[in-house]
Amino acid sequence: VIAANKQTAGRGRLDHTWTSVPGESFIVSLVVSVPVSIMRDSSVNGWLQMIAGYEMREAIVGAVRDCGGGFDENIEDIALKWPNDIFVDGQKLGGVLAEMVPIAGCEDRVAIVIGVGLNLAVAQERLPIDKAASLQLIAHDLPDVAVMRDAIAARWVRGLRSRLADFEEDSHREAVR
């Protein structure tokens, strides 16, 4: 797991850029390895990024509750927007990007670098686009940004490791779960 306080060249899908605010964003990457056979199976390989996004959604909701916070009552849902965006009530809270990287000397597994960017404590006027959201704008009683970042990251890593182990065991079952 790699967490950063500042990102200078954030990017998203299709060469889009990701703008983060130092000290106010969640910028975390996790490297996992998966069997090459999964990556070659076009019926399931696209689900890895969605699984990572789903687990991030679960981590955000769980971490807010774990830290004693709550969501504003007008918030309907935090949801995934295919293929990699995390949205809350039509506004982008963040995104997930997964990239495959070969592992030198290993023919049966590949590395997947899963990066996540979230707006944690970015003030409304500093959000990069009109349709953006920040966790502090939709939730209340949140702790310091560093505490929130660590709580989300810890939940995400736990959930994702468990889900990826299940996916590796039976990728077709997990892709539709």
Tell what function each PLM region has.
Residues V1-E76, G94, P102, A165:
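N-terminal lobe of the biotin/lipoate ligase/transferase fold
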Residues A3-N5, S29-V31, K81, L97-E99, ...:
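Short beta-strand segments
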Residues T8-A9, V88, L118-L120:
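Short, glycine/acidic-enriched loop or turn micro-motifs at the edges of active sites
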Residues V28-L30, M56, D85, G117, ...:
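Residue-level signal for inorganic ion chemistry
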Residues K81-W82, F87-V88, K92:
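Glycine- and Gly-Pro-enriched alpha-helical subdomains that act as flexible
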Residues G105-L142:
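Short, acidic (Asp/Glu-rich) active-site segment that either coordinates a divalent metal cofactor
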Residues H140-R177:
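Conserved, helical-rich catalytic subdomain that frames metal- and/or nucleotide-binding sites
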